[in-house]
């Protein structure tokens, strides 16, 4: 306890009486019971809140903070990789181009309470300061090929989301015309075409100039021009190529990526497109090599063909089919369509609406002319005409050796063949019989083939018109005659085998009066040994082929029964067969000009 008398304290001097150096002790406070029973209220009560706590909205606050942080990181990445500088480097005008239509914004009546993402974007958009950048100047003049800064162009192309649209925009900006206006689209990469339009972006100057020389070995015609970073090629290849082959050639030659290439075939029937290529080669910046393609020349260059009328001349089509020996409608249609690039009349036929009608009528007229020509010829003139159509040379000895191989006297056979060709009554039918695989059909078919004869089939005997081919040939063949056929011939064809006139029923026509042409038969049955067909013995001359057809070690025929062999046979034995000399066929001074069925006058240009 402190002394109540302050005079006895000398430890701290200089403080005066205002400072209490020791606290006074009270005995009353030593009682713990009274201390706890006393009221504990003070002026700073309720400093700690002992009430029950609630969760509140801390989870939503945490979610909002996470979204703001993620959006901030995303915006930093966008500013880093999608800078407006990249769009300006690629194309100054591309920034204003939008592929999707702009939708009008709708005004909201009530603002919704969301996570604050939209507010964050709006605030960041307001804070962005617009940047103005001057486009880089290309080191290459506008009308020269190549590119001064390839890396910049290629990098800007890679940053584009739609590379094809970007290339087309650059092409139109450079050449002033759309790429699709000059080309037609091939969806498949495997479709072949000889002509291709190729546009390449960002090519080195040296490679661009060297391509003008390297492409000449692959193409008949080359058109090349470069403006800015775009290079345009019109390539007419010597052979058809697909898009993959063209890209492989261009990428290896120009050292570019396939994404830098646009390639489509050109429009062949568009006059405006043809004029673009024709006028483009007249400029100083264009390079061309070779003659103009036909589709450009026909639409741009005037000549004597342009003065001709574009009407279709049916007689010219008939004359063409007659000269080329085309009788079937499919052959006439296909071959005449292929003639269109060379013949103006074929082009007019393709443009006509009645192509099928003209083809049917043309085939009918050619058959009429051929049939009339055949009837007007003698057998000597017919054989002379047909063997002259055979190309190449053979040896007649193969046929003679084969006849002797079958144990037939050649003089007897030659006499029978002479009477057979001249249709001597009861001598105009020859039968070749023998066992199978003896060469009967091969020998007969080779003779019919070289003389352009017709083949009859007994399988059509139920039809009353099955003998109609006899009215359209100079020689006929009935192969592999069996017993039913012999019965039919013994019953109905005796007059025809005699060489007399018969009434032959032809389709769509009245029965025709005519004689049978020389008829060649093959069979496994010797009709002369059958008593049932005794009335045919005097009408048919038979020769037996008893020996099998010989073959070489390499499984080829030992005797070549070809068209060339028969050509040599008839030429060698022309006199022995009693065939007339062709120089003595007509009257003296008669012209030997070819048959003309067209309506062209003599004073027209050739």
From Swiss-Prot:
Question: Which residues are annotated as modified residue Phosphoserine in the UniProt record?
Answer: 83, 91
User: What are the boundaries of the signal sequence?
Assistant: none
> Which residue spans traverse the membrane?
none
Entry keyword annotation includes Cell membrane? no
| Annotated catalysed reactions | Couples ATP hydrolysis with the unwinding of duplex DNA by translocating in the 3'-5' direction; ATP + H2O = ADP + phosphate + H(+)
Q: Where in the cell is it found?
A: Host nucleus
Its job: ATP-dependent DNA 3'-5' helicase required for initiation of viral DNA replication. It forms a complex with the viral E2 protein. The E1-E2 complex binds to the replication origin which contains binding sites for both proteins. During the initial step, a dimer of E1 interacts with a dimer of protein E2 leading to a complex that binds the viral origin of replication with high specificity. Then, a second dimer of E1 displaces the E2 dimer in an ATP-dependent manner to form the E1 tetramer.
* Family the entry assigns: Belongs to the papillomaviridae E1 protein family.
What's the protein called, per UniProt?
Replication protein E1
Q: Which organism is it from?
A: Human papillomavirus type 5b
